[in-house]
Amino acid sequence: YDHATGMLQKPRVVMDKGVDGVKDPHDDPTIQIDKDGYLWVFVSGRSNSRKGRIYRSINPFDITAFEMVSEFTMAYPQIMYSPERGFFFFFTRYDGTRQLFYQSSTDGRNWTSYKQLASIKNGTETRSGHYQISNICGNKLCTAFNRHLNGNVDTRTSVYVVQSTDWGQTWTTVDGQPVTVPVTKRDANCLVVDYE
């Protein structure tokens, strides 16, 4: 949207997976804008079969053209941005089944190594699985996630919440108790609702 003219540009196709026969909403993108006005598009991959991609607009505040910045294994991208710190990226990898990870970047091009956030298995379970929703409020990152019993997506249960005020260096519960990541225990201190 151009605030000066009051005009809305026509949509722009950044990446069309349909040309490869992909018609899967798992591949939907997430959009972020940085402090300089560049538009960033994080296109989800699917499992380990299709890699995710990051694109950046060639010019600030302009959807005319994009460049691909990187391609790697990731799904369900959730990208946060701080003008002071840069990008913080929550995402899923299928190293096992739907495990949660995060990484950060000051410029969107050079990223820290990804770190695992959660992979909960209980008792005799051999696989984990999670879905999450995340947000940023001021300098606080927060994510809430469930767990899938033995990795079965149809057994979504319980709610866990962790937060960080130092850009993912340390994590705590909502009441400030330290949380060790990756969260691997069913009864971890960040469990807020137990539905099992």
Identify the residue ranges that each predicted region occupies:
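Extracellular, repeat-based ectodomains that mediate carbohydrate processing or recognition
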Residues: 1-196
